[in-house]
Each structure stands twice: as structure tokens, then as C-alpha cells.
Amino acid sequence: NKIYAPLKDKWLVVKPEEEVRQRYICRLVDSYGYDINQMDQELKVTNSHRGQGSARADIVIWKSAQEKKYNKSAFIIVECKAESVTIRKEDYYQGYNYAAWAGADFFVTTNLKETRIFKVVKGELPKKLEEIVDIPTADMANNEKKVKELLNQTKAFTRDEFSRLLYKCHNIIRNN
């Protein structure tokens, strides 16, 4: 069982997370217009070590192939989890850290069932997860005005999310 990894130009053993990564790369190319020459996978983003290995971002996207070639800051970091894995808050912070280390403006966490997009809030501590509506398309990447507009489009609550939050607040007030 193998899956083709275009960013590595080779066939890899199919593992659940690898399948998610390759399917998301296809989405980046087909839906967002990114070129494989402006992306990389499993890129080391820091010199520190987590556990036994160094921190590696699943997918890294630059504004252009030229920026990738000259080791400029990344534009978007994507953190993938296997489809069977429930994404936890720690996973969002892992993506945030990778994006901050790589100098990216955006980060995505996905297991394909759930995909959430965040902007990296630079210059503020503690880290804040600010969810936004989408990542820019490749055509928008070099248009600062459009990127800024997208960074300012925060995600609205869905009815279910709002109901859950209201229910939690109600219980806190009732129990105190």
C-alpha cells in the first residue's frame, strides 16, 4: 500500500496521517491554485527537539517558488492529523508554534473531517487562537490588501457552536 507524495517526488507507505497530508496537498493545488514548487512537507521548523525528534511542519507553503528557494518566511503552515484522530486544543497550539517559528501568517489544522484555519497573532503573549474563514488562494498570496482583508475576516459562530457555548455559560452561572 503506497501513496504518491508529489512534494517528495516519491511513493510512501500509506499511513493514516500521510493519506490526509497528500489529500490536503491535492486540495491546495486543485482548490487554492498553489504550485507544488512553492510547497514542502515535513520541513524542520526549529532546532529544538520535541521528545525524540525535531519539530517538523506537515505542509509548508510560501508565497512563491522563489521565496521557497531563497528560504524566506513561510506563508501558511498546515498541521495534519489522521482522519480517525480528534483534533485537540494542544494540536492547534502545536500548529500555532510551528507557524510562528516559520514566520507564517496562517496555519491550518486538518484531519479532513474537520479543518480549522487560524491567523498567527504576532507580537502578543499569551498566544491567542483567532480562527478565520479561509486561507488565501495562490492568486491572492502576493496581494497584501487581500491578505489583510482575509486576516480580518474572523469566523462566525455556527448555531451549534453558539448553543454549546451558551449551555456551558448557563451551567457555570447556575452552579455558582
Can you annotate each of these PLM segments?
Residues 1-176:
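Non-catalytic, mostly N-terminal accessory regions of nucleic-acid modification and defense proteins
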